């Protein structure tokens, strides 16, 4: 799970479905089992407190966005609100956020089913991940080893952000793909940018074995 502190009051979490399952939660549970969804949420809050010393005291605003490979959860602490929320109010707020994200996921699932009619069931579509800190790319490169040496990677710079375009080869095992994506998600966030947009407006910095080149130059 990646934790990004946006400002003093707002924190973003990025967690893959692979990571969610490793934590003992079935993918469907977080959408349809209120208690299990709340357990995952508070587990994420506790981890943020332990890793980043972030305190979630006060009323919370929660937004959950579903991506094909995982979830983005934005939590804002409303410091200027005097009244605190009780557990039932917070639970209702969290439930609403999860319900909205579940609707997003339903659309993604339907699109995925259409994609499967045109491609191999275990073939993952290319995707982009991003960060605003190049140090995240450097830190990630030190952990990748040869994991990504056979992947078609491209690193772009666009509007003060770095975008990694990943194209998984057809012959790559699904388990290896999931492990690779789980590692990437510790440092990068899912992006909605497309390769044509990045090709046209972004600046290509590195391609091929991107992480080996980053280790070489940095």
UniProtKB/Swiss-Prot annotation:
Gene3D superfamilies in the record: 3.30.70.1950
In its UniProt record, a GO molecular function of this protein is:
protein-macromolecule adaptor activity
What function is annotated for this protein? Enables the recognition and targeting of unfolded and aggregated proteins to the ClpC protease or to other proteins involved in proteolysis.
Q: How does it assemble?
A: Homodimer.
Which PANTHER family does the record cross-reference, listed alphabetically?
Answer: ADAPTER PROTEIN MECA, ADAPTER PROTEIN MECA 1
Q: What is known of its domains?
A: The N-terminal domain probably binds unfolded/aggregated proteins; the C-terminal domain interacts with ClpC.
Name assigned to this protein: Adapter protein MecA
Q: Which organism is it from?
A: Exiguobacterium sp. (strain ATCC BAA-1283 / AT1b)
| Gene name for this UniProt entry | mecA
């Amino acid at each position: 799970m990646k934790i990004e502190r946006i400002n003093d009051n707002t924190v973003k979490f990025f967690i893959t479905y692979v990571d969610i399952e490793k934590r003992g939660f079935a993918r469907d549970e977080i959408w349809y089992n209120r208690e299990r969804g709340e357990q995952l949420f508070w587990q994420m809050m506790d981890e943020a407190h332990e890793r980043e010393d972030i305190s979630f005291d006060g009323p919370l605003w929660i937004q959950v966005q579903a991506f094909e490979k995982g979830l983005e959860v934005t939590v804002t602490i409303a410091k200027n609100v005097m009244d605190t929320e009780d557990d039932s109010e917070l639970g209702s707020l969290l439930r609403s956020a999860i319900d909205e994200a579940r609707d997003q996921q339903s659309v993604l699932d339907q699109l995925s089913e259409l994609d499967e009619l045109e491609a191999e069931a275990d073939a993952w579509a290319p995707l982009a991940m991003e960060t605003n800190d190049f140090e995240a790319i450097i830190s990630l490169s030190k952990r990748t080893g040869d994991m990504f040496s056979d992947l078609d990677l491209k690193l772009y710079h666009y509007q003060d952000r770095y975008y990694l375009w990943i194209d998984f080869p057809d012959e790559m095992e699904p388990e290896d793909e999931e492990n690779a994506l789980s590692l990437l998600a510790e440092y990068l966030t899912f992006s909605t940018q497309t390769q044509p947009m990045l090709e046209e407006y972004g600046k290509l910095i590195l391609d091929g074995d991107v992480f080996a080149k980053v280790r070489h130059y940095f």
